[in-house]
Amino acid sequence: SAAARARRLSESAEIIMFERGEFVSFANCGLPYHIGGEIQDRSKLLLQTPESFLARFNVDVRVMSQVVSINRQTKTVTVKNLIDNNEYNESYDFLLLSPGAAPIVPPIPGIENPLTHSLRNIPDMDRIIRTIEMNKPEHATVVGGGFIGLEMMEAFHQRGIKTTLIEQANQVMTSVDKEMAGFIHEEIRNQGICLLYTSPSPRD
């Protein structure tokens, strides 16, 4: 991470890292495997905690803390504690903004349905598991045929849920060539999973 790299560059600098969520570092590619039951112990998904980050890198990690404003003149940030809603100011010499990414949610009707989920972090994973346990779905649709999409497809299938995978492109795993993707398509269908993707043009 940037904080760990900053520590390697300076052993004496005071480094503070603010994280809006509860978790610092986790195995995001492992999230579907916990949903599917292959990884039973949820704690194995955690790569670093605030305590381990402090012990290893001497970095002050403050989770559940959201930076709500930046004052470049005074070189301070206003931080909101999301547990008690109190706000305080913290000074800085150098400020690095690394807010991360968010899933692309297509603007389609029904996307706000509570049974519709995205998977980016551990809270997302927990919500999906709760939905499965509470609603006992017979069918699940996965939108997106990248790494996480394929892993989620497999997770639902392993839980005995009839699964459909939808990919906007003309193949899953667009990072591989069409011949390799063809083998993946064949295996998906051999597992009894419905695969839908854009039909290739006659020139392809």
Task: State the predicted function of each range.
Residues G149:
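N-terminal Rossmann-fold NAD(P) dinucleotide-binding loop
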Residues I184-I193:
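Helical element adjacent to the flavin cofactor pocket in flavoenzyme catalytic cores
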Residues S1-V61, M153-E179:
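Beta1-alpha1 glycine-rich phosphate/pyrophosphate-binding loop at the start
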Residues G145-G146:
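Glycine-rich Rossmann-fold phosphate-binding loop(s) that bind the pyrophosphate
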Residues Y197-D204:
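Conserved small/polar residues in nucleotide/adenosyl-binding loops
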Residues R8, S12, A55, R130-P137, ...:
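Secondary-structure boundary motif
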Residues E51-A140, S199:
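FAD-binding core/adjacent interface of flavoenzyme oxidoreductases
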Residues M125, M180-A181:
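Amphipathic alpha-helical segments in well-structured domains
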